[in-house]
Swiss-Prot record:
The organism of origin for this protein: Oryza sativa subsp. japonica (Rice)
Protein EC: 3.1.1.-
Residues annotated as the enzyme's active site: S240 (acyl-ester intermediate), S240 (charge relay system), D305 (charge relay system), H343 (charge relay system)
Lineage, opening ranks: Eukaryota, Viridiplantae, Streptophyta, Embryophyta, Tracheophyta
CDD domains: Lipase_3
Protein name per the record: Phospholipase A1-II 3
Keyword annotations from UniProtKB, A to Z: Coiled coil, Glycoprotein, Hydrolase, Lipid degradation, Lipid metabolism, Secreted, Signal
Domain of life: Eukaryota
Amino acid sequence: MCCFLLVSVLLATTLTDVASAQRWRQTSGGGKDRWDGLLDPLDADLRRDIIRYGELAQATSDALIGDPASPFAGASRYAPDAFLRKVRASDPDAYRVTRFVYATSSVRLPDAFMPRPAPSAGAAWSGESNWMGYVAVAADGVAAKAGRRDIVVAWRGTKRAVEWANDLDITLVPADGVVGPGPGWTQPSVHRGFLSVYTSKSFSSPFNKLSAREQVLAEITRLLRAYKNENCSITITGHSLGAALSTLNAIDIVANGYNVRGSSRVPVPVTAIALASPRVGDDQFKRAFDSTSNLSLLRVRNAPDIVPTILPSAFFKDVGAELLVDTRRSPYLKNPAGPAQWHNLECYLHAVAGTQGAGDGAGFSLVVDRDLALVNKEVDALRDEYQVPAAWWVEKNKGMVQNASGRWVLQDHEEGNLAM
């Protein structure tokens, strides 16, 4: 009898694990239909997944020192250790940051892409590099529950996208080294600026002797080796510029075999959650992306946001599947609003939490209980009756602290914030 009960328990556990794995493959776009039937109406599990990965992308914005008066402008305010706890992530122990990622660029970019210290700020931490995000891995408990070890790459976006969007050139260049010609497509081309941020390096900067691309690929390789006996997944996420970098990073990993490990040569599935993403590449890039196995991308687009369509469709093509949301349907947000609110990541996540479909008659209901105050972290979007100040996410006293002699000095970062 005891043996029968033990076998029954083990069988039930196995079936639960199998069902969980199959469900994850579906919500991560890994099935043959790539989210077909899950977007309108939005599947409950997928809704939570988008918010979770969106929050991991939001952490990069929350940690960025953006004030040019600081010698550390363009760096992270916090060290990797307990990083997600310091940015007040909703589940700070679910992932552990294993590496920071830094980028530079060999071409001129809009100033908003990479905030830098002003000349008057004094000795700058770097004159060339910017902190561009991090790599993290799921904690043991999360991995055990999910039946897989999730590796996340979170790419930083820009706070002033409306400014850079109008100053963005439309130059396409071959995506050499990222993705090449294949069956059904010729050499893909991508936006020059996005590619430059992803692939540029500078031997004069200690942070970019390796490009952002090389840093991420090396860390993914290391983590896949460290967890070689576990089922793994790779999820890339980002907002705005970060979403464009996520798109490049995702296809790069698969096209060049960085998701294949060990003698089994079994590929690890790669999923990108790209929020408010501008278009990245041409029609050949689209063909390559949409034809590549073990690669899925979900673009989340807010209907009034101008950034996803700022690069002309005659030259640049959308890739992956699209989830369309509309912040104008939320009864909690000010209406009319403006481009800054429409593009803001917290506003996007609010829309994901409440969207009831893309049709004309679809309503809005916060089926995910997400704090309304988050909407006003960086913008003034929440209706006044909720009594939440605009742009409230600021460092106490703007990073000014009183030293032992009683004088106020700038101390806007913690020790170890420049870790690699």
